[in-house]
Amino acid sequence: MAVVTIKNLLESGVHFGHQVRRWDPRMKKYIFAERNGIHIIDLQKTITAIREAYDMVRRTVSSGKSVLFVGTKKQSQQTIAKEAQRCGMFYVTNRWLGGMLTNFSTIRKSLSRLKKIERMEIDGTFEHLSKKEVASLRKEHAKLEKNLGGIKEMKELPGVVFIIDTRKETIAIREARRVGIPIVAVVDTNCNPEGIDYPIPGNDDAIRAISLFTQLIANAVMEAGNEHGLKIIENLQDEESGDELDESVSLHEEGREITDYENYTPPEEREYSVNDEGDVFDEDESLYEGR
């Protein structure tokens, strides 16, 4: 198993929870202490949870099943896409479309449409269409790619769903539970760990914490087919620190990436709206128009 230590977790700010007044009492068993109005997460329990989740993901992938990485909030999008691609798995970073798991047959139609448009452009079909028709097809392709590009090659339901921010991804969690797919998720002190098969207590806002957790799950996937093992997390994080972060992520959001809790003030909690679980379309138009 890839190495992860308390030091790794501390350096990534994994131990920082939310303000005490924002806590979910169901997270009580994962909380070590309270300092200056901030809950501190018990990292020994985080280590244990990581090991359990890591082993489960590795076993699942070894059995021939896939992992779906889900993280649609701004801090997680870049890392989720990067790590899922690194280990050859699927991901959702734009928004979760209702029915991605519970109505996968409809989603597959959208995926087929996406691939059909790509083939049309490659095989020269576009050359025989009007500019208006080509523009319409490219617009449709861009929309499908944005929403479904990360699962383009997903032929069947995944064996595991890995989630960053359970409060935001409520529909994904509900769908996974409905179809019986095990859920691995990072749960912060303001989250409800119930219903999560493999909850990992930790900071789900800091970019470095998100990166660490996602790297570990990607490593588990890769180790399933790598008898020689992988690089330790310290080296992976050195590589990550050299990457340029998305400038659209504010410094305020990165503020949780400190190790001195006395100077730490978490960002105000965001409220997330939940779309209709059965809505497999955007609010204003169909995913695959004109058919």
Swiss-Prot record:
CDD domains xrefs: RPS2 (cd01425)
Q: List the disulfide bonds.
A: none
| Region described as Disordered: spans on this chain | 238-291
Q: Which Gene3D superfamilies match?
A: Glucose-6-phosphate isomerase like protein, domain 1, Helix hairpin bin
| Record field: compositional bias (Acidic residues) | 238-247, 274-291
Under Gene Ontology molecular function, one entry of this record is: structural constituent of ribosome
Basic and acidic residues composition-biased segments: 249-259
**Family from the record:** Belongs to the universal ribosomal protein uS2 family.
HAMAP family linked? Ribosomal_uS2_B (MF_00291_B)
Quote the protein name from its UniProt record: Small ribosomal subunit protein uS2
Organism of origin is Treponema pallidum (strain Nichols)
Record lineage: Bacteria, Pseudomonadati, Spirochaetota, Spirochaetia, Spirochaetales
